[in-house]
Amino acid sequence: MTELKTFISATGSEIVRASRNGDGDWKVLTLLSDKGVTCLADDPGNPGIIYAGTQKQGVWRSDDAGLTWKASGLDGQCIKSLAVNKHNSNVVYAGTKPALMFISSDGAQTWRELESFRQIPNRWWWFSPAEPPDFRPYVMAIAPSPTEPDLLLAGIEFGAVVRSEDNGLSWSSHIHGALRDCHSLKFHATDGKWVYQAGGSGGGAAVSPDLGYSFLKKREGLSKHYGIVCASDPVDPEVWYICVASSPFKAYGKFPETYLFRSDGHSGWKPIGWAPHPLHSSPTALVTIRDTPGHLYAGLMNGEVWQSCDYGDSWRRLPFNLKRIWHSLLIN
């Protein structure tokens, strides 16, 4: 396995980047400090290319693994989610508040709205209790398929999980079994049949084994049912992880109480973590690395990053702090 040397987080206000030099020392930089950075996405085919979404200042792009940045369109939009097509790195998706979808076919140089997203059935009642005073819904997650070039899913907070088979030209209604309050939505790294979800409704966890056509709620063994974030093992699609809490206040409040679990597909959820439950700083990002089974990284709201190399059975805290990790953590 290639040694990982760069960790990049979106804090909700800026980017924090930790990198290790040849002597093994870590250097932490703060970037885009005036942009209100909300989300990140990397290009799976070009590890140095990273995109950042911001509050009202559009999309930004880095070509050097997050060291320098340039504005890359959608100025004035509140970007809530970003993703790169896994088969064509020029194709980039952006989800916004209010809940709209945009696509770029040239690496975020130009953008166009996917207008059919406005026509999704029953979207009139979507709303987000998480962001007063307007409570407008937003696209919290975009999940492109690793095996089907034109297949992607989008998760709304709060409203629906929807599916497109034509690269966003048309969209389904809400997918049966999926959690309407979507917080995290991810395809498996290589097996495109599997999709995983964490959400604030329906028990907190759901999984699809059929390319996202339908979802099954997975509650057995979960002590709490407000899902915060999920991830899957990069090799075994039946192994996946979720962080849950009893409520949004226990997930994101001043005194968090959260719970981290692993499922292997053969039994209920098993508690894991570096401390007894409940954990007192929320894991808001879970990351696995392609071709490294058993490896899991947890990024916490307090900026800590914890690493497990054995499916979450044991952990070590990495020797740097990213200030705050708000849903987005990239590792190179």
Task: Show the residue positions of the predicted features.
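Beta-propeller blade termini and top-face loops
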Residues: 2-332
